[in-house]
A protein has these predicted regions:
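Noncatalytic, helix-rich "gating/capping" subdomain that lines the substrate-entry/channel surface
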Residues: 1-226
Length: 226
């Protein structure tokens, strides 16, 4: 899979790669899940929500204070180390480019308060209507069909953020899109990859962000996978 991400040679193949990654549980430009339709509780519907960032909150990209600045510095260093562990060159510069992309995305994301507002977040669209959230790089109807041919309508939690993210990704260089996908893949699959990758992923997300000093012992992690 990692070789497939590295081999992407045009933006035309990006949408399909995003769908394939999502099916593997790897975070992409948007999140999605199947849940109850709040206005028709007997129905289930696919919901799309804003995504595209590696830090868990938009404020971590945007707030100007020492704590957030420290997190941003640590995050870029983490991305650089992950790229280097994947055998990639120029990790620092490429990590900075991914950080710049994600900062642009954070600027169009909804605040935590708005994103959790059930009324603002209920926006239903037919499959055909989701074309308005597409860009030349991301074909939303095609992606939804690839996720499931049964999808005929969806809820989009933060429409302006989803469209804004699609537009930002369309303007981004292919190399940056690939690097971001590679990094999301390394993080999402970290526990199946060499310990050096898993340890680095935990050092940032577990220790730096959450304060957990160390990973569980190997036997405990193994039990968790059974």
């Amino acid at each position: 899979w990692l070789d497939k991400v590295k081999a992407l040679d045009s933006k035309a193949g990006y949408s399909a790669l995003v769908v394939e990654a999502a099916k593997m549980g790897i975070n992409g430009p948007f999140g999605g899940y199947v849940g109850q339709d709040d206005k028709k509780p007997t129905n289930y519907i696919f919901t799309i929500y804003q995504g595209g960032t590696g830090l868990p909150d938009r404020d971590m990209y945007l707030l100007d204070n020492p704590k957030m600045a420290s997190i941003r510095t640590a995050y870029v260093a983490h991305l650089a180390r992950m790229l280097e562990l994947a055998g990639e060159d120029n990790g620092a510069a490429r990590a900075a480019a991914v950080m710049d992309l994600e900062t642009q995305i954070a600027k169009v994301q909804w605040t935590r308060e708005d994103a959790s507002d059930a009324v603002k977040g209920y926006n239903k669209f037919t499959l055909a209507q989701t074309a308005q959230f597409s860009s030349p790089t991301l074909d939303m109807p095609a992606m939804l069909k690839a996720i499931s041919p049964k999808i005929t309508e969806v809820l989009i939690g933060q429409p302006s953020a989803v469209k804004g993210t699609a537009d930002i990704l369309d303007k981004a260089p292919l190399g940056v899109l690939k690097d971001q996908m590679l990094l999301r893949s390394l993080g999402g699959l970290a526990n199946y990859l060499p310990d050096s990758v898993a340890d680095e992923n935990f050092a940032f997300y577990g220790t730096t962000l959450q304060g957990t000093p160390q990973r569980e012992e190997r036997w405990k992690r193994a039990v968790g996978f059974t």
